[in-house]
Amino acid sequence: MASISETSDDGSNGGDPNQKPEEPHKNPQEGKEEENQNEKPKEDDHQEEEVENVPQIPPQMPLELIVSTIATLRRCHYPTLSLLSDSFRQVISSVDLFQTRSLIGSTEPVLYTLITFTSPNFEEPRWFILQRRNNTSLQLSLVTSLPPMFPGCTTVTIGHKIYVMGGLRSLNRRAKTVFVIDCRFHTWRYLQEMQVARSYAASAVIDGMIYVVGGSTKRSDDWVEVFNVETNTWENVPSVLSPYGRSKAPFNVHFVLDNKIYILDGNNRVAYDLRGRRWEDWGPAGNQLGYFWQVLYCVVDNLLYAVVPDHLHVTPIVVYDPREMGWRPVMGVDYLPNLVYSESRMTNFGGKLMILGCYQSQARFDYYGEVNVWCVEVALERREDGEIWGKVQSLSLVNKFRKSPVFVLSRTVTV
């Protein structure tokens, strides 16, 4: 019977920094003893195929040439290359390698998803990485060097980093905590705390600045904060308070489009213009934007994509163009696998739609007492006539759990 797989640290400094006295997270090493941990994946017969196209590298090659050579290769080959020598292992865990990858344009999108387990007992959310074992197969693996997250935290990504803000501590106390994850090495460190404790807030990145909205008692002077990643400082954003939203709304559903952050606040739909610093109500009856995006959605190239139930539209994926103020079908996608999409998560994966979900609803297991997690990869193409076409490129079984998973969110970084 399969179980949750782990990513090892491979000597990449993946341990926790010193814990704060209030820090509720468990030590990452304790996670290795929990029931939901996986066995190490078995070596398959395709081990040799992973390095089939890797160029031969002389053992005495200078370190600089090793860096420039490895930087051109896909990251799925790195675990095998790290076994060749100490020099290779040193290069693969170095900052120079990732800087070189960025300079020559060989970076890749990497998907992370935050998963909690609710059956038989609730567990704090943990990060999983969707990685390629070779050129084709995908595997969803627990990142053991990262601690559990606070429930209700909000996250954004910039380059190879994930910024995590707020959430609920023990006894449902809101947190001001902020930390950043370096996805190159799976390390993390604390940043300056927010000025206001928040949970289930909305967040967005505009012009390299991180905005956090709501998740606290509603007051005009501090309901919005902005974080400068260069100076590690927070500032309140003065603005006229939205008359439409509730005071302590959990902003589970939000996205950024045209420099505005759109928020589903109960039955209200509000938008905050991050540059103009003003609120708008975009939810009156007849506003098409609110039709489909409440379940499964993400933004690609400033267009909003959503998966819709079969009875609401003739195609399973639709796209919203803010310039046209309306939804259109994504052509070429006549069907999607019958996952429970209301419990799935979709994200922009290098210009593609990547969906993680299960065929069974939460707390429902198969004959073997497991829940299978599937990944659907949908490629997108804009034709000359402006129509958006899609194609389901793959459907992959990426993990099996003995507990009931809940997909909290998915994020993509560039590494």
Swiss-Prot record:
Segments of this protein annotated with the region Disordered: 1-58
UniProt xrefs under SMART domains: Kelch
Basic and acidic residues composition-biased segments: 19-45
Organism of this sequence: Arabidopsis thaliana
Key words, A-Z: Kelch repeat, Repeat
Gene3D superfamilies in the record: Kelch-type beta propeller
InterPro entries: F-box/kelch-repeat_ARATH, Kelch-typ_b-propeller, Kelch_1
Name listed for the protein in its UniProt record: F-box/kelch-repeat protein At2g29600
Residue span(s) of domain F-box: 56-103
Residues annotated as signal peptide: none
Pfam families registered for this protein in UniProt: Kelch_FKB95
Kelch repeats, residue ranges: 161-208, 210-254, 260-309, 311-355
